[in-house]
Amino acid sequence: MAGRGKLIAVIGDEDTVTGFLLGGIGELNKNRHPNFLVVEKDTTINEIEDTFRQFLNRDDIGIILINQYIAEMVRHALDAHQQSIPAVLEIPSKEHPYDAAKDSILRRARGMFTAEDLR
């Protein structure tokens, strides 16, 4: 019998999180903690950072999706995460397009390969 797979967690604006919840990613762990955070205008940076760190420490989460503009608010926490699991992916939001220049994970990945490696 195969083991249970890992979850996708989402930190984002209401539209982003709602879209993923409608897609079926919403879960509660055994302690009744959700795998998502809706960031609203009154959500503090500490709340975002605490939730991100909680997601990092959960063994049932394999991927964390975060709106890039929110990732900018807690960039130091994202940059400190060096492990491959959970993978952290920055995604665009309806109001904020994706900017590859701001994506620290993409910059790190680019540094791992040279042009020769890609031939």
From Swiss-Prot:
InterPro entries: ATPase_V1-cplx_f_g_su, ATPase_V1-cplx_fsu_euk, ATPase_V1_fsu_sf. V-ATPase is a heteromultimeric enzyme made up of two complexes: the ATP-hydrolytic V1 complex and the proton translocation V0 complex. The V1 complex consists of three catalytic AB heterodimers that form a heterohexamer, three peripheral stalks each consisting of EG heterodimers, one central rotor including subunits D and F, and the regulatory subunits C and H. The proton translocation complex V0 consists of the proton transport subunit a, a ring of proteolipid subunits c9c'', rotary subunit d, subunits e and f, and the accessory subunits ATP6AP1/Ac45 and ATP6AP2/PRR. Keywords: Cytoplasmic vesicle, Hydrogen ion transport, Ion transport, Membrane, Synapse, Transport. Pfam families: ATP-synt_F. Coiled coil: none annotated. GO terms for biological process: endosomal lumen acidification; Golgi lumen acidification; intracellular pH reduction; lysosomal lumen acidification; proton transmembrane transport; synaptic vesicle lumen acidification; vacuolar acidification. It is found in: Cytoplasmic vesicle, Secretory vesicle, Synaptic vesicle membrane; Cytoplasmic vesicle, Clathrin-coated vesicle membrane. Belongs to the V-ATPase F subunit family. Subunit of the V1 complex of vacuolar(H+)-ATPase (V-ATPase), a multisubunit enzyme composed of a peripheral complex (V1) that hydrolyzes ATP and a membrane integral complex (V0) that translocates protons. V-ATPase is responsible for acidifying and maintaining the pH of intracellular compartments and in some cell types, is targeted to the plasma membrane, where it is responsible for acidifying the extracellular environment. The keyword Ion transport applies. GO terms for molecular function: ATPase-coupled ion transmembrane transporter activity; proton transmembrane transporter activity; proton-transporting ATPase activity, rotational mechanism. It is a peripheral membrane protein. GO terms for cellular component: clathrin-coated vesicle membrane; cytosol; endosome membrane; extracellular exosome; Golgi membrane; lysosomal membrane; membrane; plasma membrane. The keyword Membrane applies. This is V-type proton ATPase subunit F.
